Amino acid sequence: MTSFRPYWDLIQHNADFRRLYLARLVSFAGDWFLVVPLLGLVYEATDSALAASAVLAAQALPAALLVPLTGAVSDRFDRKKILIISDLLRAGLALSLLAVDAVGGVWFPLLIMLLEGAGAAFFYPASTGALPNVVDEQELPVATTLMSSAWGTMAAVGAATGGVFATLVSRDAAFVLNAVSFALSALLVGRVVQNLQAARKPIGGAGRESNRDAFRYIFSHVRALALLSSKGVHSLTSGGAVALFALMSITLLETGDAGTGALFGARGLGNMIGPIVALAIVGRSNRRILGSIGWAMTVWGVAYIFVGFSPTLLLAAAAVCVAHMGGGTQFTFSTYGLQELMPDDVRGRIFALDFGIDMMAISISALILGALAQTVAIRPLLIGLGLVAVVFGLAWTTLTRPLWADLETATDEG
């Protein structure tokens, strides 16, 4: 129990962090109340794995397309206002889904997902870039772990209950709860007292020109480049695997929306507990934290090979949970590494680029795997994704080991 004390102390004693953390919790809960019912709705309307995969692609794609804008906005303007506006706009979009039956066709929910993804594209770099401004440097590993696990916590709770809720109550009710969660998140962010960015000189140049600073920083700091590459490749494999959840549940396991929610919930549970367990094991040494990223990716790959062989929902969900313990650790530790490496005046743009790379990888992977699932069995696809992750994780660990050799508790730029 002592390993959980730092997390509780941070939540209890840092009010602004607590508000940001709770805002993320409720916002992510609403996200998963939205995604699971929409996946089932689109698949039932089209009987197409590609169309169902397009739901996830539509949610992810705007983050990639808006990279030149979202990061610059995060660094130029009040991050608190960005978060509130993003939440309120997404609340309105969620309510618009109540008209999906009246409008007809699958184009409308896909359009709403595109717009919702655009709102998230502004929310992520602003909220992630703000974190080092509300916690002390020594608290950053714990804070990053908690903020990253917020996604996992609510993916577990939101997806699992969202699938059951949509089945037992209605999909419309799930859309309303999604809107309420965004409104509550905006309220919590509005109560944050501390400034969410450091004082700085005005950033000159147009958005595209100012983003060049972020690219220059990344390509002149090999550690940052290595961390971004790990996140991008993981998103490429994970995005394709997750895109198959609805198809696996509905056609292979015959468990419908509830089964889809269970798989997403297992994914979220793994993302929630994986980073906490991993940080307790490796400790606060930056050398060990960053050096374990490749091993976490390897765990994801091995577990997804087991997912491919799983004959029941229970076994599949258990393997998915283990896989995303590794995936959540990879995401959290690489995010922490980037926060340690980056100065505040480019942090928002680099996290926008990071988010954009991840979302583009998820979009591409989801569409490709959705198309392949039209003609190729689901199990070989999952096994293949697992093998790719194992090979990349081991290679990344070997190639990047020298980068972390001189790190202990403080990460130097370079």
Question: Can you name each region flagged by the protein language model?
Answer:
Residues 1-414:
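Alpha-helical transmembrane-bundle signature of multi-pass membrane transport and export proteins
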